[in-house]
């Protein structure tokens, strides 16, 4: 008895990485078969068309192989199946992970496989959605391709893997503005900011989903064949500001840093449009964030005109606060391809990649070797008084504000430019009210477990509702971390942002 592949359902984005909108795409679903001899299959470059009444589907040329190793039937609403055990690993990685040559439909798209399919005679062997080419602004349309099997043919369906081969891309074909990286990175976050053991609240947090379109050249560099029209990626902004000596500077950072950052990115956009700067991406982002922080610091100190909050055109030349007030500032820009973190002070950003924590910032402490040397070179002193302090007063070596400690305490941030990876789980931004009592690994493990536990208890939100407002699972994780910090002895204000980097999760279930 002849054996063939099982019924499968696939949602495919079928277009080149960059497509000329004037050139139509013809895509084929090729050779769904058992991968018992992968080498023979991958070397087989022939074209076939089955038209004998058994299988009727389009076959085509091959060049690039994409293997889906654990194919499952997709329900029309793409609901998330929640695992029974928190320690189980996800079967399917999130929709934000990008693969060269693949365009992924926005999770909020209404395109999906049909619930039922009518065939003239037989049963469905495979169905797939073929996306028609669109511009970024248009809603993708689709056609459903169906391969069916006649009842009168005696065949046995067996489990197998599926190899989907994409047509060879012609590098000489003109390309349009649609990019493989123009993929909606669904923002999933939760925040909390509490007084903790302090009598006054001096912290502030800010989350701005869909913050800004960033030119791909600032993320991916000058790839051959990239459109000169500078396609963009959507970024999401997150910031934690830990004030000291008062709340004025932290509050001003809350209201101003994101807009100052947007101004600097806009300036870089204009430079990229006029010419190729020749700078590396790390250098570009360092310049963007340093200029942003220095501008805000000058505004805080009354050195330059600053905008008045709530007024679009009014400017004033006056200090925001007394010169003894300052704030840390840790900021993360998250998009589908990269995470960019800037930090000034002792707040911190930590990434959970797989099961390992990765700090994306390094605390600016006076006893850090390079910071100690910089302070002494500038004529300052690091004095031990309940820990290392600049001039015996400030327990951090960099901050925004603190004019009375210039030039020993500086506002210059350090910047980390981190490409996203498939294993990325979550990102935590927090003030030292958390990090003083909890290690990076502990915080990441607690956050991940809490997110998974929330999904186990409550199920998954419909995709159309994900990314709208704060994510309840991330919110639960942030609140849980703050309670643990208090239980572990934190006496400071505690501000936390938890960002779930798995925009779409699918978990193992107990059979």
From Swiss-Prot:
Residues 1-19 form the signal peptide. It is an enzyme of class 3 (hydrolase). One of its GO terms (biological process) is abscisic acid-activated signaling pathway. It catalyses: O-phospho-L-seryl-[protein] + H2O = L-seryl-[protein] + phosphate; O-phospho-L-threonyl-[protein] + H2O = L-threonyl-[protein] + phosphate. Interacts with PYL13. PANTHER family: PROTEIN PHOSPHATASE (PTHR47992). This is Protein phosphatase 2C 7.
């Amino acid at each position: 008895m002849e054996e063939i592949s099982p019924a499968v359902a696939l949602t495919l984005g079928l277009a080149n990485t960059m497509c000329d909108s004037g050139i139509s795409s013809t895509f084929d679903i090729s050779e769904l078969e058992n991968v018992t001899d992968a080498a023979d299959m991958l070397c087989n470059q022939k074209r076939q068309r089955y038209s004998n009444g058994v299988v009727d589907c389009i076959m085509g040329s091959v060049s690039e192989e994409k293997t889906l190793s654990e194919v499952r039937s997709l329900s029309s609403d793409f609901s998330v199946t929640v695992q029974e055990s928190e320690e189980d690993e996800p079967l399917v990685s999130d929709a934000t992970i990008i693969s060269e040559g693949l365009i992924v439909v926005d999770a909020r798209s209404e395109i999906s496989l049909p619930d039922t399919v009518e065939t003239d005679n037989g049963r469905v062997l495979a169905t797939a959605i073929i996306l028609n080419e669109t511009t970024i602004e248009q809603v993708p349309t689709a056609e459903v391709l169906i391969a069916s099997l006649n009842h009168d043919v005696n065949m046995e369906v067996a489990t197998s893997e599926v190899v989907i081969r994409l047509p060879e891309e012609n590098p000489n074909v003109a390309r349009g503005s649609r990019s493989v990286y123009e993929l909606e990175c669904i923002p999933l976050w939760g925040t909390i900011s509490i007084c903790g053991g302090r009598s006054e609240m001096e912290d502030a947090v800010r989350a701005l989903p869909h913050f800004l379109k960033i030119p791909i050249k600032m993320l991916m560099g000058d790839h051959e064949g990239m459109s000169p029209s500078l396609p963009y990626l959507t970024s999401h902004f997150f910031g934690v500001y830990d004030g000291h000596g008062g709340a004025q500077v932290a509050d001003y950072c809350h209201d101003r840093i994101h807009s100052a950052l947007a101004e600097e990115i806009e300036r870089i956009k204009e430079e990229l449009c006029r010419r190729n700067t020749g700078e590396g991406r790390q250098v570009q982002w360092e310049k963007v964030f340093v200029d942003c922080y220095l501008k805000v610091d000058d505004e805080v100190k009354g050195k330059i005109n600053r905008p008045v909050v709530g007024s679009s055109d009014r400017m004033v030349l006056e200090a925001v606060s007394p010169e003894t007030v300052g704030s840390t500032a840790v900021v993360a820009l998250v998009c589908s391809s990269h995470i960019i973190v800037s930090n000034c002070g002792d707040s911190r950003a930590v990434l959970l990649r797989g099961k390992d924590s990765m700090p994306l910032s390094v605390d600016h402490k006076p006893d850090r070797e390079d910071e100690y040397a910089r302070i002494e070179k500038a004529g300052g002193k690091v004095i031990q008084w309940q820990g290392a302090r600049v001039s015996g007063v400030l327990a951090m070596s960099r901050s925004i504000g603190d004019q009375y400690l210039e030039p020993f305490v500086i506002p210059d941030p350090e910047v980390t430019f981190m490409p996203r990876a498939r294993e990325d789980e979550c990102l935590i931004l927090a003030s030292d009210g958390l990090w003083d009592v909890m290690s990076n690994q502990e915080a990441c493990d607690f956050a991940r477990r809490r997110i998974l536990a929330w999904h186990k208890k409550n199920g998954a939100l419909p995709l159309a509702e994900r990314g709208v407002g704060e994510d309840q699972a991330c919110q639960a994780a942030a609140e849980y971390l703050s309670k643990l910090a208090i239980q572990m002895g934190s006496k400071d204000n505690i501000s936390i942002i938890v960002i779930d980097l798995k925009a779409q999760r699918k978990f193992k279930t107990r059979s």
